[in-house]
């Protein structure tokens, strides 16, 4: 902890310290193409350590399972959590909620991305392809721009 705090204080005089929660890292994308928000299949992210810039943007550094290797009830729970985050924050067409699922099956909110990545290594396109077609999603988004609750 001491070395981590020294590293943090090298950037600023304030630091946010959070409890570490061990578990499965999940990314749940929510899309709204005019029919209300719906969650895409959750993406399970597996790395050899940290999910940092290198692990995100260099193919082969992370492994993705879509849908996540969870039972259906847990998948529905994390999808509902992501939709709740999306609607509570009043988000528009797209968001991606990152969660940690602990060993008891409780999803812990990490953050929400209101402009999720759309590159070949980004998680929303991976989830969209697993559900059907990324091209179909793009088409629906173009036909229904700037949807807000």
Q: Language-model features: where?
A:
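Gly/Ser/Thr-rich beta-alpha loop segments that engage phosphate groups in nucleotides
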Residues: 25, 92, 118-119
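Residues at alpha-helix termini
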Residues: 10, 88, 129-130
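Phosphate-binding site of ATP-dependent enzymes
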Residues: 1-80, 106-108
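Peripheral (often C-terminal) accessory segments that flank ATP-dependent C-N-forming ligase machineries
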Residues: 67-68, 73-76, 80, 88-96, ...
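C-terminal active-site "lid" helix and adjoining low-complexity regulatory extension at the edge
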Residues: 101, 106-149
């Amino acid at each position: 902890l001491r070395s981590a705090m020294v590293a943090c204080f090298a950037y600023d005089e304030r630091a946010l310290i959070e409890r570490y929660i061990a578990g499965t890292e999940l990314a749940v994308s929510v899309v709204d193409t005019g029919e209300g928000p719906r969650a895409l299949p959750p993406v399970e992210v597996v790395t050899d350590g940290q999910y940092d810039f290198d692990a995100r943007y260099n193919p082969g550094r992370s492994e993705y399972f879509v849908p996540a290797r969870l039972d259906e009830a847990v998948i529905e729970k994390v999808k509902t959590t992501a939709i709740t985050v999306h609607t509570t924050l009043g988000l528009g067409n797209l968001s991606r909620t990152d969660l940690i699922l602990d060993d008891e099956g409780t999803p812990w909110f990490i953050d929400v991305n209101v402009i999720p990545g759309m590159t070949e290594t980004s998680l929303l396109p991976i989830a969209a392809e697993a559900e059907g077609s990324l091209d179909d999603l793009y088409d629906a988004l173009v036909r229904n721009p700037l949807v807000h609750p």
